[in-house]
Amino acid sequence: QVAAAGRAGIRAVTMNSANVTQWDEIQARVRAGEVDVLLVSPERLNNPVFRDEVLPHLAASAALVVIDEAHCISDWGHDFRPDYRRIGTLLAGLPPRTPVLATTATANRRVSADVAEQLGASLEEGEASGEQVLVLRGTLERDSLHLGVRVLPDAASRLAWLAAYIGRTPGSGIVYCLTVSAAMEVAEHLRTAGVEVAAYTGQTDAAERERLEEDLKANRVRALVATSALGMGFDKPDLAFVVHVGAPSSPVSYYQQVGRAGRGVERAKVVLLPGSEDRAIWEWFGSQGFPPEDRVRVVLDALEERRAAGGGAMSTAVLETVTSLRRSRLESMLKVLDVDGAVRRVRGGWESTGRPWCYDAERYARVEAARRAEQEAMLTYERLGTEPSPYQGSSSCRMAFLRSVLDDPLLEPGWRCGACDLCGGLDLPDAPDQEQVGAAR
């Protein structure tokens, strides 16, 4: 992002964990008017030093605050991130009438309304009370995308089909997988089949990620085989194809990932290869959501006992010893509790604020119901053309379905893209022969 801004003549910098020693210098440049754009991840708002010592000075001089991927603010959304809720605290402390712009390409009407409501409430808490939130929604039509689905009987058939398909498809692209292990397996098979690819997952270190992204942009590899770790911020205008080996759990997240293709070319191929194991994977990820109340109370009680005894903060590692939760799930839970005001991250770990906290069972049930509805919508997308769709006028067109699910305000009744497999705009190869499948087993 910083490099792209520089090429456009915009002076952009970022503050992150990799350049802490430069924070003072960057702040001085901001105060001197030598920076046009400061890029900060929402996760940075939970860093005690940044939150308490750096942010107040930066917010005071901001002429515009932009929230990208704003759908992450809403727990109605497919990609809720608790750290985004801290943006509300930032907005409440802005000088009067500071403009705020929130952008997203993947929010339906419900998520858009929730984001607007939360932003408005945050502004009203600060000195900018009385300001209204204006919501602008445009079309989601992407005429360069040729969408298709190929249902194959097993994993070996999908691997064999994929190797043959990429081998005959021009250009470079992304192959998305649902898990790290699947990404590694697919990448290994493609390399064995003579296709130049590399794996890109959440376990790939930052320097290697940057190198792999540059390799794809320069077409030094045919594809990156990636999990959702390859997402926000990546831009390759001439990306020629996106293939999903396994379906995402939501049409909204699917639309976001396939939207990386065809930004600067007239035609890009987008193929979904669903698997029978997809639902089990969705259920596993869903089970990693907010824990039951008894597990939350164990952590809160431990922090409160430490506070009452006059002790210091408890690290995440120490808190792991009082709960059966995995580290990643524990950290996610603590972030939600932080946003809710029950705990606070400080130097050395976490501490209780002493404020009462109620387990919002209705909220978590609502989020779970929304998650299951999104899963059913994804299954409906897979079955388009074979059975009626509950979405008005979208049974015979994949892009019309995605636009309908996302509440595209400009979708006209009966509209069809003319580019997907159901519209006759994309021909997909048949199932691979037994020899190819056998080689993939």
Predicted regions and their residues:
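Helicase motor core with emphasis on the C-terminal RecA-like subdomain
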Residues: Q1-L303, G311-V318, V343-G354, C358
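C-terminal accessory region of SF2 helicases/translocases
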Residues: V221, L239, A247-Q256, G262-R441
